[in-house]
């Protein structure tokens, strides 16, 4: 089964992120949840983003790369919200990842390298009415998602009919158990 590095969102390594990791692990996988904030968590996304800006996104990226180096056995990298950035970066610049899972966020295919790694599966989960996704992530992901007309595109994009950014985190008001169950099932299918 897969070894996965899962990066948390802007609120930090919340109990809800840990719970999601346990749900993913229930498929027989090992999920590592590095703490990019050194134990700090935040009540609102705005507070968490302010902390991330204080640390600097380059520093968050470096911490993510160090976490990947600590878990060299991992073959899958994943991120939620802000955590998509270090996951995406690792998938593009560290050889050996067979999959990248992006939840509540997406980046340009060439964000950290000229081309997406052809051997790295890309699975994206976004809310269709999520204000954060509507700032560009959803449109960006749709531009390279596989469709009936373009089956050769690199990403599998799953769109959820919700305005909740962190619907997969049970410790937030955004949590939706039904959508989370669908998301986890799709991740298990990818990793099977």
Q: For each predicted feature, which ranges?
A:
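Short beta-strand immediately N-terminal to the catalytic nucleophile in serine-hydrolase-like folds
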Residues: 77-79, 103
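Conserved alpha/beta-hydrolase "acid-adjacent" motif
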Residues: 131-140
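Serine-hydrolase catalytic machinery in alpha/beta-hydrolase-like enzymes
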Residues: 1-72, 167-171
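Conserved strand-to-loop "acid loop" that flanks and positions the catalytic carboxylate
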Residues: 9, 123-132
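Gly/Ala-rich beta-loop-alpha elbow adjacent to hydrolase catalytic centers
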Residues: 79-87
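A conserved short beta-strand
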Residues: 96-107
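Short beta-strand/loop motif that positions the catalytic acidic residue
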Residues: 118, 124-126, 160
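C-terminal catalytic histidine-bearing segment of alpha/beta-hydrolase fold enzymes
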Residues: 151-192
């Amino acid at each position: 089964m897969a070894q996965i590095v899962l990066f948390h969102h802007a609120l930090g390594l919340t109990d809800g992120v840990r719970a999601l990791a346990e749900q993913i692990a229930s498929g027989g996988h090992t999920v590592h949840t590095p703490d990019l904030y050194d134990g700090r968590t935040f009540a609102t996304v705005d507070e968490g983003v302010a902390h991330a800006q204080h640390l600097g996104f380059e520093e968050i990226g470096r911490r993510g790369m160090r976490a990947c180096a600590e878990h060299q056995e991992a073959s899958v990298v994943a991120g939620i919200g802000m955590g998509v950035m270090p996951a995406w970066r690792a998938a593009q610049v560290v050889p050996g990842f067979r999959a990248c899972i992006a939840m509540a966020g997406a980046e340009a295919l060439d964000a950290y390298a000229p081309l997406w790694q052809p051997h790295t599966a890309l699975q994206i989960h976004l809310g269709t009415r999520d204000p954060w996704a509507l700032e560009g992530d959803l449109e960006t992901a749709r531009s390279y998602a596989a469709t009936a007309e373009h089956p050769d595109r690199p990403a599998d994009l799953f769109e959820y009919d919700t305005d909740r950014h962190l619907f997969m985190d049970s410790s937030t008001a955004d949590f939706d158990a039904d959508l989370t169950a669908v998301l986890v099932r799709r991740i298990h299918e990818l990793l099977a």
